[in-house]
């Protein structure tokens, strides 16, 4: 009743409320009111508020605001807003101090800070599954945005936590389409390596992959060579591998929330449709675009059908899906781990590098390396209080 009691005093003098803010943190209430009233009654108002505060057992402080100061405050409302999100298994005072030092050095002001995750357990046995996320709402124009982003990424790499910097626009608050890479993103393996081992050509496939990473051959050529080595593999092997796919931590929780919130979701993969469709049926993805292996008489032919889904094609598909769903490209999110994902990560409104190599992380701008894929929810702005683990069941 503190807010009610104090505003009732102001109401008796017909005061206008120009600004109001309140927070209750660990049983400590902080209430700020900016109000306008007739100068002739300001003394009476302050006296009554002091009496009411004493009666309620709270402290009260008054700060007169001149017309000039008020008008300057109004002018500042046009400044850009930014959202800085920090995320990890746990967060330390050192990490928060480092982040806020960078914010201050860029001449930005922190308007508000809120915790998005639930209350952290003290039990060390469950800490490995804990999540901690804090969101800063920041106002102003950075003196050097690129430097700020680089410092955040460097800090993230050395201090074992993830960080996101997003401009607080209309689109940040209404993302509608999320596109995922599959191998080493939705699942903790590379399916083609699993198939190669079962076909007895694991070392040969690894050698081709190494050549591609050295830049000796491009993705399309390496893909053709690796698929050719799978010739003769029984189709039943794919079913066996699909049923044992190691799904990445947080996928089920993330997909439950995204589906309940009405997001469209897609798998855009340089892997194979067989496994993408398996995940689609299990978790309810709306779209799957991947490479289709040719099968004849129950065995792989060593060939593929249709166009190769490479990095360029992933970006094209993201734009196509946004158009089909009538979604602005700024409302899209892309998540991936490899260089092949960079085109879609840089095309999307929000590109997130997931457990990726440094080059991919630096280019994407946003990254998650410390927790599972449900970390995506916090970068969108979801709070744990909106997320119910108890309803994480699928009936597709």
PLM feature spans:
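Short glycine/serine/threonine-rich phosphate/pyrophosphate-binding segments
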Residues: 2, 95, 186-189, 341-344
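Conserved active-site and cofactor/substrate-binding residues in soluble primary-metabolism enzymes
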Residues: 40, 44, 94, 143, ...
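Short hydrophobic segments within beta-strands
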Residues: 87-89, 179-181, 268, 335
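Active-site neighborhood of HAD-like aspartate-dependent phosphohydrolases
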Residues: 170-220, 224
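Long, charge-rich alpha-helical interaction segments
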Residues: 211, 224-230, 242
């Amino acid at each position: 009743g503190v807010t009610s009691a104090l505003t009732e005093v102001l109401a008796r003098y017909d005061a206008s409320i120009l600004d109001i803010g309140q927070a209750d943190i660990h049983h400590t209430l902080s209430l700020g009111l900016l109000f306008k009233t007739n100068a002739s009654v300001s003394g009476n108002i302050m006296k009554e508020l002091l009496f009411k505060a004493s009666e309620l057992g709270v402290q009260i402080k008054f700060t007169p605001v001149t017309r000039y100061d008020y008008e300057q405050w109004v002018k500042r409302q046009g400044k850009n807003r930014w959202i800085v999100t920090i995320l990890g298994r746990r967060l330390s005072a050192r990490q928060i101090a480092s982040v806020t030092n960078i914010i201050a050095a860029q001449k930005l002001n922190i308007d508000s800070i809120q915790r998005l995750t639930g209350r952290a357990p003290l039990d060390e046995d469950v800490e490995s599954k804990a999540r901690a996320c804090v969101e800063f709402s920041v106002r102003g124009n950075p003196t050097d945005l690129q430097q700020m982003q680089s410092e955040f990424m460097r800090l993230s790499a050395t201090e074992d936590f993830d960080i996101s910097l997003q401009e607080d626009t209309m689109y940040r608050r209404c993302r509608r389409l999320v596109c995922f890479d599959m191998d080493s993103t939705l699942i903790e393996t590379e399916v083609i390596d699993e198939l190669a081992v079962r076909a007895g050509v694991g070392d040969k496939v690894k050698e081709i992959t190494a050549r591609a990473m050295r830049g000796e051959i491009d993705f399309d050529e390496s893909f053709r060579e690796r698929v050719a080595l799978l010739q003769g593999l029984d189709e039943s092997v794919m079913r066996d591998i699909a049923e044992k796919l190691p799904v990445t931590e947080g996928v089920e929780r993330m997909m439950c929330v995204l589906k309940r919130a009405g997001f469209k979701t897609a798998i855009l993969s340089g892997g194979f449709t067989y496994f993408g469709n398996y995940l689609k049926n299990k978790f309810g993805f709306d779209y799957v675009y991947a490479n289709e292996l040719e099968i004849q008489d129950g065995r792989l032919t060593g060939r593929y059908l249709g166009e190769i889904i490479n990095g360029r094609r992933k970006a094209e598909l993201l734009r196509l899906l946004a158009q089909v769903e009538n979604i602005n490209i700024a409302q899209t999110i892309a998540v991936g781990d490899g260089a092949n994902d960079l085109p879609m990560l840089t095309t999307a409104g929000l590109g997130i590098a997931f457990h990726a190599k440094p080059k991919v992380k630096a280019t994407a701008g946003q990254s998650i390396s410390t927790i599972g894929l449900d970390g995506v929810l916090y970068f969108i702005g979801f709070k744990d209080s909106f997320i119910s683990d108890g309803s994480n069941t699928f009936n597709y």
